[in-house]
């Protein structure tokens, strides 16, 4: 079996990230020792996927304050807040980023009685705990999702909600890995996911390396394979779930959900509870990141449209809750009415 790709590691007091911008052609690991480096890695998508962004940001908080000189607890906590506010500007849509930063800030405040050295140690411990928790969350999501699958199923996924977007297993791909462990033969179809192609460069790569049957299709082929009866279920990840069950995920997810509804195919969303944002009432309030035009018209160093073309490049879209069959969390499977049942997860 091919060497395991590990998206996030903590080694020698540094955050080590797998550079996902050069996959699948190169496997490059890069070390980061500053908050500025982590911010850049998140922004240019060397690390991506809501859970992985959250974990990386948590380590980024520690890296941002570990060299702070001895000071009062009040001054140190102010510095933690400053670093958190800075890292929060890296990408606006993934709620895990803000969840992790709020958690790190809370830990600093709750331990204000400690020495500065002890506070720094406590922040690193918390970042490592967030890292460990993510792996267990993913496995639990996979176990719940697997109850909706059966041997021989055809499953469509979009973008990369895989092990490369988390710390292990992934969210949408977790049942695929667990099915492999059970000896099941799922047939996975992975949308390439324009414009950054995470479905082909990342999902296909990691599943293929794991020995899972995966077929790459272009985004505009999804309707065709559904119409041919090749798809029994769709499962995607998400960057944020609003209180009413609306789901923000990689651009193109909305279209896939509409097709699934038309062909009466279950549309599942794999969502760790930190991705569920009860403070955001509906998808209309979710900020949608817009990215550079070059991703659309100059993806591989050559222009595929006139240089002067107007380009609209939202990184995410919002799937309405009406199109969602179920939201799969580490705590269980949530079905409509989502407004009511999502709240129960936190009671």
UniProtKB/Swiss-Prot annotation:
The keyword ATP-binding does not apply. One of its GO terms (biological process) is pentose catabolic process. The lineage of its organism: Bacteria, Bacillati, Bacillota, Bacilli, Bacillales. Belongs to the EIF-2B alpha/beta/delta subunits family. DrdI subfamily. The gene is drdI. Keywords: Carbohydrate metabolism, Isomerase. Disulfide bonds: none annotated. The record marks 159 as: Transition state stabilizer. It comes from Bacillus mycoides (strain KBAB4). It is an enzyme of class 5 (isomerase). Coiled coil: none annotated. It catalyses: 5-deoxy-alpha-D-ribose 1-phosphate = 5-deoxy-D-ribulose 1-phosphate. Substrate binds at residues 48-50, 91, 198, 249-250. This is 5-deoxyribose 1-phosphate isomerase. Catalyzes the isomerization of 5-deoxy-alpha-D-ribose 1-phosphate to 5-deoxy-D-ribulose 1-phosphate, as part of a 5-deoxyribose salvage pathway that recycles this toxic radical SAM enzyme by-product to mainstream metabolites.
């Amino acid at each position: 079996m091919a060497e395991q790709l590990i998206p996030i590691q903590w080694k020698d007091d540094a955050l080590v990230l797998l550079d996902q911008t050069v996959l699948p052609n190169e496997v490059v690991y890069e070390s980061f020792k500053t908050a500025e480096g982590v911010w850049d890695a998140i922004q240019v998508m060397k690390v991506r996927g809501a859970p992985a962004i959250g974990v990386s940001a948590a380590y980024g908080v520690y890296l941002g304050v570990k060299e702070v000189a001895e000071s009062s607890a009040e001054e140190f906590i102010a510095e933690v807040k400053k670093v958190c506010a800075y890292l929060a500007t890296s990408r606006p849509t993934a709620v895990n980023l803000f969840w992790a930063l709020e958690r790190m800030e809370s830990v600093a405040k709750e331990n204000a009685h400690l020495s500065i050295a002890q506070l720094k140690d406590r922040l690193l411990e918390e970042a490592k705990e967030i890292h460990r928790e993510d792996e267990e969350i993913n496995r639990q999501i996979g176990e719940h999702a697997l109850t909706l699958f059966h041997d021989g199923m055809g499953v469509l996924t979009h973008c990369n909600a895989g092990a490369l977007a988390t710390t292990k297993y992934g969210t949408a791909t977790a049942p695929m890995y667990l099915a492999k462990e059970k000896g099941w033969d799922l047939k996975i179809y992975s949308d390439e996911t324009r414009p950054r192609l995470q479905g082909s460069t990342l999902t296909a790569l990691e599943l293929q390396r794991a020995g899972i049957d995966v077929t790459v299709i272009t985004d505009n082929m999804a309707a065709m394979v559904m119409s041919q009866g090749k798809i029994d279920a769709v499962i995607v990840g998400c960057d944020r779930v609003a209180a009413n069950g609306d789901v923000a995920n990689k651009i193109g997810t909305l279209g896939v959900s509409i097709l699934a509804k038309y062909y009466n195919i279950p549309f599942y969303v794999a969502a760790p509870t930190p991705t569920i944002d009860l403070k955001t009432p509906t998808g209309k309030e979710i900020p949608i990141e817009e990215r550079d035009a070059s991703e659309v018209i100059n993806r591989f160093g050559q222009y595929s449209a006139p240089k002067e073309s107007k380009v609209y490049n939202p990184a995410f879209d919002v799937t309405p809750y009406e199109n969602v069959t179920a939201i799969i969390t580490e705590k269980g499977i949530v079905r409509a009415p989502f407004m009511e049942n999502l709240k129960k997860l936190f009671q």
